[in-house]
Regions:
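RNA-contacting regions in translation and RNA-metabolism proteins
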Residues: 1-43, 55-87
Length: 87
């Protein structure tokens, strides 16, 4: 699915350290989970004021996933954060 590349493109456009952007896609039968990891300095840029940027990214990927009768979940994580700990 193109969701991974879509989120990578959006995130790299927003951050100061695009080389630290990493997206992991976990596909299920009806749901796709996208784990977006960015540098600690860029976390605020990706989340946005009051979470508006994160909400907008979630809206875009859900619209794209709906075309394929799926649901998408975006988790935003700190790049150096241990695996499994969501912010």
């Amino acid at each position: 699915m193109a969701l991974k590349s879509l989120i990578e493109y959006i995130a790299r456009s927003l951050v100061d350290h695009p080389d630290h952007v990493d997206v992991k896609e976990i596909e299920g039968e009806k749901t796709t989970i996208l784990e977006l990891r960015v540098a600690e300095d860029d976390l605020g840029k990706v989340i946005g004021r009051h979470g508006r940027t994160a909400k907008a990214m979630r809206t875009v990927i859900n619209a794209a996933a709906t075309k394929e009768n799926k649901r998408a979940v975006l988790e935003i994580l700190e790049a150096d954060h241990p695996e499994g700990q969501q912010l």
